[in-house]
């Protein structure tokens, strides 16, 4: 049996904005385009959702529902940086990661040895580390397949964890409305309802041949989902851009000397992760990342530099000089060169 975790950040864009500007918290706010420019809401916080504001809603309509709604423009680079930090945490546990967007992903932790292979404890630790490192919350679902893990992550949102064990699958699926099934959109849901099928229990009363006749090849999928079956694998990103290690410290590191003391253990873990890489990758530029106590951060990389302790120490010193403030997080890594890219260049010429 597989162990799949679906991780979904809670109101991701809005959470980043509220973290970086605490004056936005505890009031209805959204990230999106301006109403006068026919903008659309990208996401909103839970205070705004209480008024009926939703993603993909026209900003003008959102303001009618909630006249006090504050709409801020998106800062996509900040969201990408946060997403990369979260994926660095994911890679501590597994390389089998399928990103669905900046703020959600599937993880296959079937072969993971952390916490004696407990997917529940891994999900708990991911949630703890994301909060500790980024000060935003994520919800997680744990189940034997992707379909159920995604439903589970939404079950106790926000800031929740829900687990569906193999023994619980049958009972859980029976009560699900068909609108929760992966691939069932409005048209299919309406057709099912006209047939008197509203839940998976209803769907199970139909045999495979009936469903194939009524829905074509999708009927086979419907039958499987109604029985809690979903064999889709976690689709791993085809190419990695870098490998890195980050650590957030319980107490801020006060000066450069304290940061340098932490470097050897980080590089030891980086070496271990690089040894697990596919042979098609070779190391490129080293880089370091610092997040200061006020959540500002800087990243520095250097072409032609080596991958030894002294090389990273030099980069760390320059990065620290940019802020000269207590440090809450240190990251070290190396950009990767994919040999397939070079082979493609040779064929071109």
Where are these regions (language model features)?
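Gly/Gly-Pro- and Ser/Thr-rich, intrinsically disordered tail segments characteristic of DNA damage-repair
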Residues: 1-214, 219-220, 334, 338-349
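DNA-contacting surface of Y-family translesion DNA polymerases
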Residues: 6, 180, 190-329, 339-343
